[in-house]
Design a protein with these regions (language model features):
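Cysteine-centered iron-sulfur cluster-binding motifs in ferredoxin-type domains/subunits
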Residues: 1-5
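Catalytic cores of alpha/beta
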Residues: 147-162
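Auxiliary Fe-S-binding modules of radical SAM enzymes
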Residues: 160-274
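Hydrophobic faces of well-ordered beta-strands that scaffold small-molecule active sites
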Residues: 40-44, 75-77, 98-100, 135-139, ...
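Conserved Radical SAM active-site core
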Residues: 6-101
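Structured alpha-helical segments in the cores of large, soluble enzyme domains
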Residues: 29-35, 86-91, 118-131, 221
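Long, hydrophobic N-terminal alpha-helical segment
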Residues: 129, 134-143, 152
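Conserved radical SAM core fold
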Residues: 48-51, 82-85, 96-115, 141-146, ...
Length: 274
């Protein structure tokens, strides 16, 4: 059975289709030159899935120990997995939180092969929140298809019903964005995917929805999250100032300002979560 997401640029990072697991991750983390006077938001799972392989080769042990030794970081585990047994049984430091990619089950079935179902992701997030671990949600990619409004409204309402704002560190919004090598690889793979059927414009050297479509889909999801406005940190992934201003009514001046705001919001909730 094929696993992985058809649309993900991660597949262009690797050439042989194999997963490699570090045997000395703890040593490599120890060697990272962190400034004790600075704060860091570190995302684990940027080029993989933080929880899919569990604690193979002690990779989760190493990351928890790294977070425990560095109180000036917040370490985010990004996942589409239901594999949370390790975290439920571990002594998880308060500066770690876990975030899930959220999409309607229809999209998961067609494009996110071999990943946990929507219900499994939500149940896993609920279990970690119940254990005092902060969670987050990435509505990325939000996809415009026939019936998308109904499906995403249901999804947002499900999240709102299952979690309180105090349990959620952040919510991100994003959509399909393709780099040229990924488009070529997807076309040559023979994968039964519909993501390349979307109308795309050039966007910062990549391919993505037209700006008018982005504004429409982001605004709809943002409005559905109205009960959490001002209570949860929201942001958009890789979007221009014009889109931020149109949807949120504001935009950070630079990445440093954005990272400072994210760190303050998330770390503030971490101090109350456990």
């Amino acid at each position: 059975m094929r696993t992985g997401c058809s649309y993900c640029s991660i597949q262009t990072f690797y050439t042989n289709g194999k997963i490699a697991v570090e045997s000395n991750l703890a040593e490599k983390l120890e060697a990272i030159p962190l400034d004790p006077d600075k704060n860091y938001h570190i995302g684990s799972g940027q080029s993989s899935d933080s929880l899919a392989i569990g604690n193979t080769n002690g990779v989760l042990d190493a990351q928890l120990d790294f977070a425990r030794k560095n109180s000036n970081i917040i370490l985010e585990f990004k996942t589409k997995s239901k594999n949370i047994k390790y975290l439920l049984n571990a002594d998880v430091p308060p500066n770690i939180f876990v975030s899930w990619s959220m999409n309607p089950q229809l999209f998961i079935d067609h494009e996110e092969h071999g990943t946990a179902s929507l219900e499994q992701r939500l149940a896993a997030a609920r279990a970690l929140a119940d254990s005092g671990i902060l969670v987050g949600f990435h509505f990325h990619p939000i996809v415009n298809y026939q019936g998308w409004k109904k499906d995403y409204r249901y999804l947002v309402q499900k999240v709102l019903a299952m979690f309180s704002p105090s349990e959620v560190g952040l919510v991100s919004l994003g959509t399909l964005t393709f780099i040229k090598p990924l488009i070529q690889k997807l076309r040559m793979s023979g994968i039964d995917s519909k993501v390349l059927q979307i109308p795309m414009d050039k966007a910062a050297g990549k391919k993505s929805y037209p700006k008018s479509t982005k504004k429409k889909i982001f605004q709809m999801v943002w409005n559905e999250f109205r009960p959490w406005h001002g209570k949860v940190f929201f942001y958009m992934c890789m979007e221009e100032r014009e889109i931020w201003d149109a949807v949120f009514g504001n935009c950070y001046e630079n990445n440093s300002e954005f990272e400072t705001a994210l760190f303050q919001h998330v770390s503030g909730k971490m101090s109350h979560a456990q």
